[in-house]
Amino acid sequence: MSAQCGLCFHRCRLAEGQTGLCRARANRGGRIVPLGYARLTSLALDPIEKKPLRRFRPGSLILSAGSFGCNLRCPFCQNAEISTAGEDFPARDCPPEELVQLALGLRTRGNIGLAYTYNEPLVGF
């Protein structure tokens, strides 16, 4: 049974077992399911200046987290290996509650929050 994904502008129509253009959603039993939910491919404590923000809390750190999959194909993407990967890419399970606790635990090292990055964050919704 085919199903249509409505998460992004591509609106992929997927046959049973097929994965969408983003490689982060698939048709399983006629339902669109997220493949990367609560799975991390990358995790790092980064300077806030690495984010595309200007003059936001300069000198602070932020926990950067990301998974696989992206609905874009930017020719300049510095994370293409991660963002265009699929569910076979090495990832670790990390439920949202665990990620929040990790971010909170890093406050003593100057962490100010959590940034979803490395891939297009919407596809993991």
Task: Please report, for each region that a protein language model flagged, where it lies by residue.
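Conserved Radical SAM active-site core
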Residues: 27-125
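Local cysteine-cluster metal-coordination motifs and their immediate loop/turn environment
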Residues: 3-25, 68-80
